[in-house]
């Protein structure tokens, strides 16, 4: 598990907190307006027809609210949600056990659905399309296939890597929603709401400062607030002020754009050793001592989002914006 303070991945300490902070309805849900408005229509239409909602695929960077939306979908439809993950379903029998336990209309939420094994996907296809399950009884020449009917259900899949899904699986989702990074104003609203739950006073400017450094991600915003709250209680009077916030985030090595020491290491490594690029991913991996898939999936998305890094056919290139951020001049060609 990624232990970075600024990781969008869920950490152990996040689980209970996220549950207590989780909105229960689309009306309470902040941000993701496009996805939210579309889901409102699809859910209302399904309820009017007294049908289950089409299968939903939620994709985008970690920490943006995919699990929260899955639970909201179940709440809005008035049904139960069963939660599992791609890595937890190791055999077709594991999936069969989950599917046969569902009640009519239930939501089955599979996180990290891109990590399902292909043999398990093949069991899932008829379940998604025809609400039935084909299982093999016996072994060898006496083995026979039996089809079991399943109650109608809605599969909600979540992934940070939509491109890693097989085309047959992706095509079976009727609703595809990409979750985008949040704006500073949206994150500030989330920070202030979280502070209310914590029963901590926070200045509006402090909430904005945390939001600016949260990399567009609610999970990171809430995590930063927890750490700043610690400083406010120990080094201040308990109120999260702008002064306390800036001091805390500086000590936590989170700069004004939400970059940490690993981001600095990656960008400065390319600048100082490869004159800003282009440089191949594997070379970057060897230079900073991180696995290439971790760089690609965890570190790079935000750097691409803010325009500090470019991916080109020839390799990674650090942009003029990054040089400006570090107070450095770009090398002359």
Swiss-Prot record:
Residues 256-333 are annotated as: Head domain (RuvB-H). GO terms for biological process: DNA recombination; DNA repair. It catalyses: ATP + H2O = ADP + phosphate + H(+). Keywords: ATP-binding, Cytoplasm, DNA damage, DNA recombination, DNA repair, DNA-binding, Hydrolase, Nucleotide-binding. Residues 183-253 are annotated as: Small ATPAse domain (RuvB-S). GO terms for cellular component: cytoplasm; Holliday junction resolvase complex. It comes from the Bacteria. It is found in: Cytoplasm. The RuvA-RuvB-RuvC complex processes Holliday junction (HJ) DNA during genetic recombination and DNA repair, while the RuvA-RuvB complex plays an important role in the rescue of blocked DNA replication forks via replication fork reversal (RFR). RuvA specifically binds to HJ cruciform DNA, conferring on it an open structure. The RuvB hexamer acts as an ATP-dependent pump, pulling dsDNA into and through the RuvAB complex. RuvB forms 2 homohexamers on either side of HJ DNA bound by 1 or 2 RuvA tetramers; 4 subunits per hexamer contact DNA at a time. This is Holliday junction branch migration complex subunit RuvB. It comes from Bacillus cereus (strain AH187). The gene is ruvB.
């Amino acid at each position: 598990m990624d232990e970075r303070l600024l990781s969008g991945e869920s950490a152990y300490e996040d689980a209970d907190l996220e549950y207590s902070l989780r909105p229960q309805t689309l009306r309470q849900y902040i941000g993701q307006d496009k996805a939210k408005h579309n889901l409102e229509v699809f859910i209302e239409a399904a309820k009017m027809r007294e049908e289950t909602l089409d299968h939903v695929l939620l994709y985008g960077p970690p920490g943006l609210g995919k699990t929260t939306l899955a639970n909201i979908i179940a709440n809005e439809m008035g049904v139960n949600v069963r939660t599992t993950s791609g890595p937890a379903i190791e055999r077709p029998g594991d999936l069969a056990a989950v599917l046969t336990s569902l009640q009519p209309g239930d939501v089955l939420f599979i996180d990290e659905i891109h990590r399902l094994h292909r043999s398990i996907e093949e069991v899932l296809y008829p379940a998604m399309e025809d609400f039935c399950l084909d299982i093999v009884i016996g072994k060898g020449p006496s083995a026979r296939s039996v089809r079991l009917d399943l109650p109608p259900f809605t599969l909600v899949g979540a992934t940070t890597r939509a491109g890693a899904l097989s085309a047959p699986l992706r095509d079976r989702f009727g609703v595809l929603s990409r979750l985008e990074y949040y704006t500073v104003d949206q994150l500030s609203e989330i920070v202030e709401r979280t502070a209310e739950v914590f029963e901590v006073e926070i200045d509006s400017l402090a909430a904005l400062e945390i939001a600016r450094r949260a990399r567009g991600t609610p999970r990171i915003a809430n995590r930063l607030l927890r750490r700043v709250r610690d400083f406010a209680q120990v080094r201040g009077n308990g109120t999260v002020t702008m002064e306390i916030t800036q001091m805390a985030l500086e000590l936590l090595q989170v700069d004004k754009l939400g970059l940490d020491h690993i981001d600095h290491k990656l960008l400065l490594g390319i600048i100082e050793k490869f004159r800003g690029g282009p440089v191949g991913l594997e070379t970057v991996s060897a230079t900073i001592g991180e696995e290439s898939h971790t760089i690609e999936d965890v570190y790079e998305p935000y750097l691409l989002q803010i325009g500090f890094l470019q991916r080109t056919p020839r390799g990674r290139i650090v942009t003029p914006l990054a040089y400006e951020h570090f107070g450095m001049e770009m090398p002359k060609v």
